[in-house]
């Protein structure tokens, strides 16, 4: 899968899947997560509740509903605490697990935002 860096609204990208940085309870939060939930519609909230939560670095998938992509990969990035609690490794897990899921599904395109860069304050 070739790499391309773009600046675009994640909720408007036509691709196989987008990665949605969320929280451990998969309830609409702020930042990208809020925008994804608004654009996808109320069915996304129901689907997220069925997933039963996430751990930091874990990735789970839902349909994209009203988004132009096919799937949403939900992941929880680490909260930056000075770099002393394996935040770098946990952040790498978010990206690695997203890419591994995309590969297992044989996806051709995946839109990845900067995870934990807004609310989690990670140094990326």
Task: Give the location of each predicted region.
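Short, basic/glycine-rich phosphate-binding loops at helix/coil junctions
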Residues: 67-81
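Conserved acidic residues
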Residues: 16, 70, 108
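Phosphate/ribose-phosphate-bearing ligand recognition and processing surfaces
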Residues: 79-121
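N-terminal and secondary-structure boundary signal
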Residues: 1-7
